[in-house]
From Swiss-Prot:
GO terms for molecular function: transmembrane transporter activity. The lineage of its organism: Bacteria, Bacillati, Actinomycetota, Actinomycetes, Mycobacteriales. One of its GO terms (cellular component) is plasma membrane. This is Uncharacterized transporter Mb2022c. The keyword Transmembrane applies. Pfam families: AA_permease_2. It comes from Mycobacterium bovis (strain ATCC BAA-935 / AF2122/97). It is found in: Cell membrane. Keywords: Cell membrane, Membrane, Transmembrane, Transmembrane helix, Transport. Coiled coil: none annotated.
Length: 440
C-alpha cells in the first residue's frame, strides 16, 4: 500500500481557488441537469409505478459512494478521483480501469449533455449547436477554474428557480392526484433496479468534486463536507420534482413523455411555464456539461502524469494554472462525438462506466484503516455491491457496449505493460553487455 500523496510530490500543481460553496455548486451543476431532464422518463419506463422506489435505491447507493469518495478524497487530495484512489489502495491496474471508465464514459456523457442543449435550443440544428456549446465551454475552462465556478453557480441558481416553479405549479393545479403515487402491479424488482441504475447516472455528479482535489482550498475538510451536501440537496430536488410530475402525469404517461416536465405543465394547464421549462432544461444540461468537461480533463491530467495517457497531456498552463492540453483534447473529442453521436446511446454507455468507477471507489474505501478515516465497513460494502448490481441491471445494449469499451482499455493496458517490460529487459541486457565486454 502506498503512502498518502504529498503535494510536493505532484508536478505542476494546480491553483487552489475553490471554497466549499464552489465545490458544492460544481456538484449540483453536474447532477441536477442530467437527472431531472434526461433520466426521469426512461426510469419511469423501466420501473412504472415503482419509480420512487428506484429513486430511493439510487439514493442509498449514491450516499454510500459519496461517503467512500469523501473519505478517500480527504486522504488523497489530488486531481483524478478514483483513478488516484484505486492506484494507491488496490494497485495500478484498478486505478487505471477506474480512470479509463471515467474518462471514456464521461466523455460520452459530455456529448449527451451537449446534444440535450442542442435539441432544446434549436432542434433542427441540434448537432451544430452542441458543437458550438462544447467549444465555448472548453474556452471558459481554459481561461481558469474560477470563471467556471462562477458560471456554474449562475446556472444552478436558474435551474433551481425553474424547478421550484414547476413543483409549485404542479402541486397547486387541480391535475395533481396523490393516488397516482401508489405502487401498482406493474412495479417489479428488476425494473426498479434498472431505473435506479439510470437515475444513478444523474446522481454521479459529486465525482467532479473529488476530481478537483488539487483546486479546492483545504481539501481534507472541504471535500468531505461538499460531497454529502451536494448529494443531499440533489436528492431533495429529485424527490420533490418526481413526486410532482408523477402526481400530474402518472407513471405510464411520464414514461412516454419526450419532455416530461413540459408535459406536466401542459396537463396542469400552466402553458406559460412551458417555454420557461425548455430554457431551464437547456441551461441545466449546460451546467452538467460545464462540470463534466472540467472533471474529465482533470482525470486525463492525472492519468497523463502516470503515463497511462500521453505525458504531454499533463502540461499545466503557466498563467491560468489549468491542464490546458488535456482540456483542449477532451473538448475536441467531445465536439466530434456531439457532431455524430446518438444521445440515447451515449447516456446508456456512460451509466455503465460510472457504476464501474464507483465500484472501484468503494473497494478502495474498504482498504482504509480506522486511523485513515475509513467509514463503517457496511457503507463501502453496500456501495460496492449496489454498483455491481445496478450496472448489470441496465439494458443489455448498455452493458455490452460498456463492457466492450472497458475491454479495449484493459487490452491497451496489457499491451503497454508488455512493451514497457520488454524495453526494461532490453535496457538491462545492454547494461550487462557494456559492463562485461567479451575478451578477444
Amino acid at each position: 500500500m502506498r503512502r498518502p500523496l504529498d503535494p510536493r510530490d505532484i508536478p505542476d500543481e494546480l491553483r487552489r481557488r475553490l471554497g466549499l460553496l464552489d465545490a458544492v455548486v460544481i456538484g449540483l451543476g453536474s447532477m441536477i441537469g442530467a437527472g431531472i431532464f434526461a433520466a426521469l422518463a426512461p426510469a419511469a419506463y423501466a420501473a412504472g409505478s415503482g419509480l420512487l422506489l428506484g429513486l430511493a435505491v439510487a439514493a442509498v447507493v449514491a450516499y454510500c459512494n459519496a461517503i467512500s469518495s469523501a473519505r478517500l478524497a480527504a486522504r488523497y487530495p489530488a486531481s483524478g478521483g478514483t483513478y488516484v484512489y484505486g492506484r494507491m489502495r488496490l494497485g495500478d491496474f484498478w486505478g487505471y480501469l477506474a480512470g479509463w471508465g471515467f474518462v471514456v464514459g464521461k466523455t460520452a456523457s459530455c456529448a449527451a449533455m451537449a446534444l440535450t442543449v442542442g435539441f432544446y435550443v434549436w432542434p433542427a440544428q441540434a448537432h451544430a449547436v452542441a458543437v458550438a456549446v462544447v467549444v465555448a465551454l472548453t474556452a471558459v475552462n481554459y481561461a481558469g477554474i474560477q470563471k467556471s465556478a462562477w458560471l456554474t453557480r449562475s446556472i444552478v441558481a436558474v435551474v433551481l428557480v425553474v424547478l421550484t416553479a414547476v413543483v409549485v405549479a404542479a402541486y397547486g393545479s387541480g391535475a395533481a392526484d396523490p393516488a397516482r403515487l401508489d405502487i401498482g402491479v406493474d412495479a417489479h424488482v428488476w425494473g426498479m433496479l434498472q431505473a435506479a441504475g439510470l437515475l444513478f447516472f444523474a446522481f454521479a455528479g459529486y465525482a467532479r468534486i473529488a476530481t478537483l482535489g488539487e483546486e479546492v482550498r483545504d481539501p481534507a475538510r472541504t471535500i468531505p463536507r461538499a460531497i454529502p451536501l451536494a448529494l443531499g440537496i440533489t436528492l431533495a430536488v429529485y424527490a420533490l420534482v418526481a413526486v410532482a410530475v408523477i402526481a400530474v402525469l402518472g407513471p405510464q404517461r411520464l414514461a412516454r413523455a419526450a419532455a416530461p416536465l413540459s408535459e406536466a405543465m401542459r396537463v396542469a394547464g400552466v402553458n406559460w411555464l412551458i417555454p420557461v421549462v425548455q430554457i431551464g432544461a437547456a441551461v441545466a444540461a449546460l451546467g452538467s456539461l460545464l462540470a463534466l468537461i472540467l472533471g474529465v480533463s482533470r482525470t486525463t491530467l492525472a492519468m497523463a502524469r502516470d503515463r497511462h495517457l500521453p505525458r504531454w497531456l499533463a502540461a499545466v498552463h503557466p498563467r491560468f494554472k489549468v491542464p490546458f492540453r488535456a482540456e483542449l483534447v477532451v473538448g475536441a473529442v467531445v465536439a466530434a462525438l456531439a457532431a455524430t453521436a446518438d444521445i440515447r446511446g451515449a447516456i446508456g454507455f456512460s451509466s455503465f462506466g460510472v457504476l464501474v468507477y464507483y465500484a472501484i471507489a468503494n473497494a478502495s474505501a474498504l482498504t482504509l484503516g480506522l486511523d485513515e478515516g475509513r467509514p463503517r465497513r457496511l457503507i463501502p460494502l453496500v456501495g460496492l455491491i449496489g454498483c455491481v448490481v445496478l450496472a448489470f441491471a441496465l439494458p443489455l445494449s448498455s452493458v455490452a457496449a460498456g463492457a466492450a469499451v472497458l475491454g479495449v482499455g484493459v487490452a491497451a493496458y496489457g499491451v503497454r505493460r508488455i512493451i514497457t517490460r520488454r524495453a526494461r529487459q532490453t535496457d538491462s541486457g545492454d547494461t550487462q553487455r557494456s559492463g562485461h565486454p567479451s575478451a578477444t
